[in-house]
Amino acid sequence: MSCSLINEDFDLLKAAKNPGUGAKLSAGALDKLLKNFSVRNDDNLLVGFNTSDDAAVYKINDKTALISTIDFFPPVSGDPYIFGQVAAANSLSDIYAMGGEPKLALNLFCITKDMPEDMIKEILRGGFDKVYEAGAIVCGGHTIYDDSPKYGLAVNGFVHPKKILENSTAKEGDVLILTKPIGTGILLTASKADMSPPEELDRCYKIMAFLNAKARNIMVKYKINACTDITGFGLLGHLYEMGKGSGMSIEVDYKSVPIYKSVIESAEMGMMPAGVYSNRNFVGDNIVFENVPLAYQDLMFDPQTSGGLLISVDKEDAAALYEELSQALENTPCGKPAIIGLVTKRDEKILRVS
């Protein structure tokens, strides 16, 4: 995947207590911090933080809106180039989830004083190459010293004001499609104890570095009512936000959810990031599980790094969208997408998993 070498004198992965989006502040803690803040009234601010969406959107004119997002996190790999690629793909993903196209990016970089210069360059090169692949431009950034490495980007993109995809606009009857497997947090946690199969870990890195651009370019041709990308709040955390924001309930078929190999075994052994528990607490009693093994429950709360798009598509377009996505993705590291559930009329519980 890269021509860089892992530095034997500086272990990039072990420098991170919580790799990737596992370091993200929990959704519950974030809600508590922001609840007393109000967004300044501006008619051109089309999407703010009130619905916990993927990015902010500001209307420039009748044909153009600016999408603005930011993401950075600790290392997910001992290979600096792979870390740079995954961090960049994760940062770009919010633009795609909103239905937009990325254009400009700024590096956000925390380095330690003992990091080798070649390693720093490789992280930046990984990020630069991935942004270039996306058709966008890295045009600057900001770098500081810190106790542990962190990298990501602030990204700006554009979308037509009437074609914005939000996470809080799902409709009753929508079909839910997921474009990447879940389990990155558990897989990365197990890898720190050398308990993840090397071939599956390599596949995970390739999938995390895979842009959601292809899925975005296909889905915008169909009637999509809502979309988000699966990251730090886990599959069920993001589904909960979608259901709550949309005033709907959501039914999930857990056996249809695509997963990485070995993650169930790791979950059964308790090899999970702390985010699994904070995400479960965030959803609270707004969910009911029907005959779902505990390990699968934990897996669906697992914080994801550079996860797939969760697409809420009108039922009339679902079959055609699924077919086109399948043809486009089945020969990529991601493999075929999966239909994982349905949006239903709001009932007592927001989420029902069976």
Curated annotation (Swiss-Prot):
Cellular compartments per GO CC: cytoplasm
Entry keywords, A to Z: ATP-binding, Kinase, Magnesium, Metal-binding, Nucleotide-binding, Selenium, Selenocysteine, Transferase
Binding sites annotated in the UniProt record for Mg(2+): D54, D94, D229
GO biological process: selenocysteine biosynthetic process
The protein's Enzyme Commission number: 2.7.9.3
Sites annotated Important for catalytic activity: K24
Family statement: Belongs to the selenophosphate synthase 1 family. Class I subfamily.
PANTHER family, alphabetized: INACTIVE SELENIDE, WATER DIKINASE-LIKE PROTEIN-RELATED (PTHR10256:SF0), SELENIDE, WATER DIKINASE (PTHR10256)
Protein name stated in the entry: Selenide, water dikinase
Species of provenance: Treponema denticola (strain ATCC 35405 / DSM 14222 / CIP 103919 / JCM 8153 / KCTC 15104)
